[in-house]
C-alpha cells in the first residue's frame, strides 16, 4: 500500500511532521543569521569593538526562539482557545505598562520595549500573536453573530480600537497597521457581511489617514515617499540610500559581504532595511529567491488553514489564516518600504531582520502552526455537515 492511501492519523509520527513548513522556517532563519552578520559587521565593529556583536546576539535569540517553540508546540490548541480572553487582558496590561515612564524603555523616540534583563521585549510583537489567538477564538465561537448582527461586528472592532490606540501611543504606526489589517482580513474570512466589511475598510483607512495627517513626522514621511530625491540628504536620506543599494546589486549582486551601503550609508541596515542589503549583495535574483521562500511559507500555512476548515476545526483554521495573513502583510510592507513602493515604517522582515522580540514571536507563531498541523494529522476524520455561510466563504477564499 502506498503512503498516499494511508489516512493521516495512521501515519508514523515522523511523517506527520510538516517537513516542508519546517524546512522553509529553518531556511529563512539561517539566511537571517548570515545576513545579520554581513549587514551589521561594520556598525558592530565601530560601535561595540566587536564585528560579530549582533551576529552573536542573533544566535542567542535563535536558540531562545527554538526552545520557546519546543514549549509552544507542546501546548494543545484547545488551551490557547480556552485562555484567549486572559491572554488578551495580559497583553493589554503590558501595552499600558510599557507606556509608563521609568518602566517602558524609549529607543529612537518610541517607548515600545520592556527591559527583562538580557533582553528587551517589544510588546507590540506579543500583541500580534495575541490578536491572532483572541480573534480566532472569538470568531470561531460567534461567527453566526458576526454574520447576522451588529453586536458581532462592533465587539471585535472595539477591541481592535483599543489595541491600535495603545500602539499609536508608543508610537508604533507600522504594527498598528499590520495588526488591524490582519484582524479585518480574519473578520472577512470568518463571515462578516460585505457591507459591514466595506464600512470597516473605510473606517480603517480614514482613521489611519487621520493619524498620518495629524502627525507632522508621519506626514513628512508621506511627502518624502512621493519624491525621496527632492531631499536626499535629509528626510529622504534613508530611502534613497536603500534604493542605491538596490541599484548597486543589479542582477546577481556584489557578493556576500561586499555591500557598500552597510558602511554607515544606510541606517538600520541590519534591521528594518536588511532587504536592501540582500538586494545589493545578491541582486535581483537573490531578492526574488527570498520573496519566493516567503510566498512558499505563506501558501503552506494557508493550505493548513484550509485543511483544518474542511475538517470542521474552526479555531485552528482561523488562527492559521491569521498567521498567514500576518506574515503576508509584514513581508509586503517591509519589502515595499525597502524598495520605495510604500512610505517608511519601522517593521522587521520576519526571521531575517535583527531583533530579539520579532524573532522569538516568529518562532512562536511557527510552532503554533506546526501544532495545528500536527493535531489535524492525528485527528480521526469525522463527517462534516454542509458548511454554513462563513465557512463556505472561507473555503472559496482559500481555494
UniProtKB/Swiss-Prot annotation:
It catalyses: [GlcNAc-(1->4)-Mur2Ac(oyl-L-Ala-gamma-D-Glu-L-Lys-D-Ala-D-Ala)](n)-di-trans,octa-cis-undecaprenyl diphosphate + beta-D-GlcNAc-(1->4)-Mur2Ac(oyl-L-Ala-gamma-D-Glu-L-Lys-D-Ala-D-Ala)-di-trans,octa-cis-undecaprenyl diphosphate = [GlcNAc-(1->4)-Mur2Ac(oyl-L-Ala-gamma-D-Glu-L-Lys-D-Ala-D-Ala)](n+1)-di-trans,octa-cis-undecaprenyl diphosphate + di-trans,octa-cis-undecaprenyl diphosphate + H(+). It is found in: Cell inner membrane. It is an enzyme of class 2 (transferase). Residues 1-20, 80-83, 137-147, 193, 303-316, 370-399 are cytoplasmic. The chain crosses the membrane at residues 21-41, 59-79, 84-104, 116-136, 148-168, 172-192, 194-214, 282-302, 317-337, 349-369. One of its GO terms (molecular function) is lipid-linked peptidoglycan transporter activity. This is Probable peptidoglycan glycosyltransferase FtsW. The gene is ftsW.
Amino acid at each position: 500500500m502506498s503512503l498516499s492511501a494511508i489516512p493521516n492519523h495512521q501515519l508514523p509520527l515522523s511523517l506527520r511532521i510538516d517537513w516542508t513548513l519546517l524546512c522553509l522556517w529553518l531556511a529563512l532563519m539561517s539566511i537571517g543569521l548570515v545576513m545579520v552578520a554581513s549587514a551589521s559587521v561594520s556598525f558592530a565593529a565601530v560601535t561595540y569593538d566587536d564585528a560579530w556583536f549582533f551576529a552573536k546576539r542573533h544566535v542567542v535569540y535563535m536558540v531562545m526562539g527554538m526552545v520557546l517553540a519546543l514549549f509552544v508546540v507542546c501546548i494543545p490548541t484547545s488551551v490557547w482557545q480556552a485562555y484567549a480572553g486572559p491572554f488578551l487582558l495580559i497583553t493589554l496590561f503590558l501595552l499600558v505598562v510599557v507606556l509608563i515612564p521609568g518602566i517602558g524603555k524609549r529607543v529612537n523616540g518610541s517607548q515600545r520595549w520592556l527591559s527583562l534583563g538580557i533582553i528587551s521585549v517589544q510588546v507590540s510583537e506579543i500583541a500580534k500573536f495575541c490578536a491572532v489567538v483572541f480573534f480566532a477564538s472569538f470568531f470561531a465561537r460567534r461567527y453566526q453573530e458576526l454574520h447576522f448582527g451588529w453586536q458581532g461586528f462592533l465587539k471585535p472592532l472595539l477591541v481592535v480600537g483599543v489595541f491600535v490606540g495603545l500602539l499609536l501611543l508608543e508610537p508604533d504606526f507600522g504594527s498598528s497597521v499590520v495588526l488591524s489589517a490582519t484582524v479585518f482580513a480574519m473578520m472577512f474570512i470568518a463571515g462578516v457581511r460585505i457591507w459591514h466589511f466595506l464600512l470597516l475598510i473605510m473606517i480603517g483607512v480614514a482613521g489611519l489617514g487621520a493619524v498620518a495627517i495629524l502627525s507632522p513626522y508621519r506626514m513628512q514621511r508621506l511627502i518624502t515617499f512621493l519624491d525621496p530625491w527632492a531631499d536626499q540628504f535629509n528626510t529622504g536620506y534613508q530611502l534613497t540610500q536603500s534604493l542605491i543599494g538596490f541599484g548597486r546589486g543589479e542582477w546577481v549582486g556584489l557578493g556576500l559581504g561586499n555591500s557598500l551601503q552597510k558602511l554607515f550609508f544606510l541606517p538600520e541596515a541590519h534591521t528594518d532595511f536588511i532587504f536592501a542589503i540582500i538586494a545589493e549583495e545578491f541582486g535581483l535574483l537573490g531578492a526574488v529567491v527570498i520573496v519566493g521562500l516567503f510566498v512558499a511559507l505563506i501558501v503552506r500555512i494557508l493550505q493548513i488553514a484550509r485543511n483544518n476548515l474542511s475538517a470542521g476545526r474552526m479555531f485552528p483554521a482561523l488562527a492559521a489564516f491569521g498567521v498567514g495573513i500576518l506574515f503576508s502583510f509584514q513581508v509586503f510592507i517591509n519589502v515595499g518600504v525597502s524598495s520605495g513602493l510604500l512610505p517608511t515604517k519601522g517593521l522587521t522582515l520576519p526571521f531575517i531582520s535583527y531583533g530579539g522580540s520579532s524573532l522569538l514571536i516568529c518562532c512562536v507563531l511557527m510552532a503554533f502552526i506546526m501544532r495545528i498541523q500536527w493535531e489535524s494529522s492525528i485527528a480521526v476524520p469525522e463527517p462534516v455537515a454542509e458548511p454554513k455561510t462563513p465557512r463556505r466563504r472561507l473555503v472559496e477564499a482559500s481555494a
